[in-house]
């Protein structure tokens, strides 16, 4: 039979062990999200020579599938880094809500879709976000340029070819969403609880 002191010692060890595990998990996530945020912004910079073709939509969806609500951390670390790198000019402001829109849509997708369905749905959603980018960006542009309704529609029409390129690029790069999210989930499960 154990004495009351032995039970208290075991409880203390258990509390300390749980606290260490939580701190370890927090440090792991902090480092991981900083690296993923840096990769998010670096991918945009690296792909600058290709107009409107980048990994931001793909990474937003991958991070959301893998980390759910916590995906906002690396996404907005990356958005902040893009602002620090290129300056916090007016183009940067819509990035703050454009990523949030795609994150929200991804959060609304069922989590337990069959693999074959995911392989179609994820690239299509990513692509639709690219096709709609100009229309989603337009209200902000109209606001800062003082455009009326007609001016905003003309602005959207003028950028339509770039939105088409953006949507096609997002679809092509969106084909990476399923394998990357599976990789992230597998690696996170393997290394996060050590």
Region locations from a protein language model:
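Context-gated lysine
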Residues: 2, 22, 44, 70, ...
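Short helix-perturbing small/polar motifs within transmembrane alpha-helices
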Residues: 2-37, 74-78, 94-145, 178
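Short, contiguous, pocket-lining structural segments
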Residues: 26, 30, 51, 169-172
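Alpha-helical membrane segments and adjacent membrane-interface helices in multi-pass membrane proteins
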Residues: 37-110
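Membrane-embedded alpha-helical hairpins and interfacial helices in multi-pass inner-membrane proteins
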Residues: 92-94, 115-194
